[in-house]
Amino acid sequence: MSRRAFARTALSGTAALAVGVALPAPRATASPVPLASLPPLPPLDPGALQAAIDDLEHPPSTAAQLRVGGTAGHWRGTSGVADIRTQRPVTAHEKFRVGSITKIFVATVVLQLVAEGRIALDAPVRRVLPGLLPDRFSAVTVAHLLNHTSGLPDHVGIPEPETAEEVFRHRFDHWTPREWVATATNGPLKFAPGTRQEYRGINYVLAALIIDSVTGRPYGEAVAARLLRPLGLAHTVVPGDDPRIHGRHVHGYLAMADGGLRDITVYDQSSVRGEGDMISTTRDLDRMLTALFSGELLPPGLLRLMFTLPPNDVRMLDGSPARYSTGLQRAVVNGVTLWGKTGEKYGYKNAAFSTRDQRRRFVLAYHPTTARDGAESQMIARISDLLTRDNPGAGGSAV
């Protein structure tokens, strides 16, 4: 794998397109999709779903957990082992690193603060976080961070591991949030804020710092007080400076050049604080989606923002339509619109998506051993296809 590919993984903690290998970019819209326009969903096929997660060769993985919910049916399944040393089978209640699914929690808390009048979406970030961003970034607002239209420049001056061995060697490198922000604020803006969209983890590192500033306590404490405890998410944590996963969990592994696997479960998460550092379970993530989509966490006007893409003239840097809203991403699979998020850390990959009306939700967590070689989204593709394709004989795009 190239130096640049490893660096992208270290920077974002999620897939570059965040959803997968075969997803056609959906048409951007400035308003939510009408629920009546949603196509029919297929009945659940337990055998096919189990076969899809049993295929731990595509991509090479050590384990998988799948939880399907919603009014159209429920199913749970597991495959593989949580620990290759002990060969302990994975269960449906294992903790794992959620990667960029963290952003759903952070965006929700920021919007709660907006609802309380403690911050405004159009507030310049420099005003909320004095002295952190240079003067030339004065046009960047809180809203621009949350929907990835900030235009912040690329990181410079950070380690760029070239091999899996180097990734493993640097797994305990530690950064303060302000040190990490400084690596992405040296150059000029890549585009005028609000005019283009580029998925960047640094946007949510800043969003977490905003939560720190507005609430007067670390963002993890705010997430726990506002979301984790009220919703009973007892197995979801913001780890802070602790590189370990406590309690029953799935180990993550990374394939080395000699073909062996190294346990990369214990890993410093300081560079992804607020954008990819949380730990959870499939049950807890399903509960979070249910509460969010049901309107338990936000007033209607702010909840609509999470299902609203930027205007049609705001496009991704590659010219494709925008696909990120405030805290979520949109994917269209076999004509079915899904909202949610993918996440990725070394040894961990997952997806949490739902139709807007919650007829179908799914949380998938699996454990590829490759360092993002372009094929790691194959399991997400299989599952999303099975859960949305009404005609089993038809082809279709996948998340």
Residue ranges and their predicted role:
Residues M1-T14:
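N-terminal secretory signal peptides and thylakoid transit peptides that target proteins
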Residues G20-R27:
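C-terminal segment of classical bacterial N-terminal signal peptides
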Residues D45, L49, V98, T102, ...:
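Hydrophobic (often cysteine-bearing) scaffold residues that line and stabilize catalytic clefts
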Residues P60-T62, T86-A143, F191-R200, R273:
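Short active-site loop at a secondary-structure junction
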Residues H74-R76, R136-L338, T342:
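Short, surface-exposed loop or secondary-structure junction motifs
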